[in-house]
Amino acid sequence: VKLDLALRELHRSETSLGRRFRRVGERHQADHDVFHLCADLAGWSDDHVRRITEAGTSHGVRLADSPPRIGQVMSSVRKMASVALGRRPEPGLLLLADLRSVYLHAAAVSVDWELLAQGAQAARDTDLLELATQCHPETLRQMEWANTMLKELAPQVLTS
């Protein structure tokens, strides 16, 4: 059974998604809704990573326990850049690009959850199937948020 490969890839992609949400939030701190929602959505990915790590341990797969955190220096730099960008006309285009990236990455994570679920079902691994059943809907909600934001912002940004 190659479920260990699915767990490793899912761990990597969820870790990356959480990091991506944090970067977008920090880059767009001037938009408080985006900043706070990105922090919340990154937290969902952090929880998924923790649960994937626990599942990996019970399946003999060693995975890094916690997603890497961005250092204080980089956080300060991004905050200053966010304030500076907030005064320029291009932050809308940057936000669209960031949301597009988040959406596409969340879609890839969604596929990883689906692969794990299908593999777990075929292997009759109820623990992994339950994990996928519980976490995958949150990934779909992360995608939905990014898609909704794209739909709301695109007309204004692309026609101004």
Per-segment meaning from a language model:
Residues 2-10, 31-51, 98-105, 127-139:
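Alpha-helical scaffold segments that form or flank carboxylate-/histidine-based iron centers
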Residues 3-26, 73-123:
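Acidic/histidine-rich alpha-helical segments that form the ligand environment
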Residues 24, 48, 142:
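Short alpha-helical functional segments enriched in proximate histidine and acidic residues
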Residues 24-34, 59-60, 117-133, 152-157:
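Inter-helical turn/loop segments and adjacent helix faces that build the functional surface
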Residues 32-80, 146-149:
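Conserved alpha-helical segments that form or flank metal/cofactor-binding pockets of metalloenzymes
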Residues 62-80, 126-137, 156-160:
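Charge-rich, acidic-biased intrinsically disordered regions
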Residues 139-160:
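Short terminal or interdomain "cap/linker" segment that borders an active site or interface and mediates
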